[in-house]
Amino acid sequence: VGVIVRSMNLRLDDLPHTGMTNYKDTPLEMRIPAAAISTNGAEKLSALLKQNPNLKLYYKQSCQTYDDVLSHNVIGEITGSEHPENIMVVGGHLDSWDLGDGSQDDGAGCVQSMAVLEMFKQLNYKPKNTIRVVLFMNEENGLKGGIQYAQVAKNNNENHIFALESDSGGFTPKGF
């Protein structure tokens, strides 16, 4: 028994868009294997199942889960000229999935965020509020960098008045 999931994208290709299965507190003996397959693979499997509804599929996985290791967010900022205690955050995340090099998910968001500070410096613009860039670690595996950032900000009584994380690649923004 297992589950096969069609890749969650609209392109027809042979690259599965990976994700993760989270069993939370499900006992080990109740967990079932799960795998994502490419859109082309899903189309082929669907056609085969239509031809033979009793088709049996055998697949073998060799994936592993490694223990977490210490990692860090990367933070840079321009201190506000009038209200340095008010913090505006823009950010992206540093980690990526196994099939990608991270250039879209989420290298583009990191570069976009760093460009905010670079442009302000080039224009010699002095923001009234603190502008902080946060490159979050471990977004893909449980948002751990963001959770840690929020906890530290809370412990330090920081006043965040704005936050924006770019995580849709270097394409036209779809919302704000």
PLM segments and residue spans:
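BRCT (BRCA1 C-terminal) domain core and associated BRCT-interaction motifs
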Residues: 4-21
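Short gly/pro/ser/thr-enriched loop/turn and capping motifs at secondary-structure boundaries
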Residues: 10-13, 38, 171
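Soluble metallo-hydrolase cores and metallopeptidase-like ectodomains found primarily
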Residues: 21-103, 115-128, 151
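Structural recognition of the beta-strand scaffold that forms the well-ordered cores
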Residues: 2-6, 34-36, 75-77, 87-91, ...
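Short, well-ordered, mixed-charge alpha-helical segments that flank or form enzyme active sites
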Residues: 11-14, 67, 143
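Charged, often glycine-rich, active-site loop that binds/positions anionic groups
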Residues: 17-23, 143-148
